[in-house]
């Protein structure tokens, strides 16, 4: 299981080439991660397998 933490920068694997965001919350029980994608998009929930860590906070 990928270890993601609040503040990590992540790339959304099923998104476009510029779809990166910041982890806001991680639910270990459901393996869902809330990612902030910017002020125009806001936060979205993704399964942790759909994300790749770009760099740590």
Question: Model segments located where?
Answer:
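Basic/aromatic-rich interaction segments and small domains that mediate binding to polyanionic partners
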Residues: 3-56
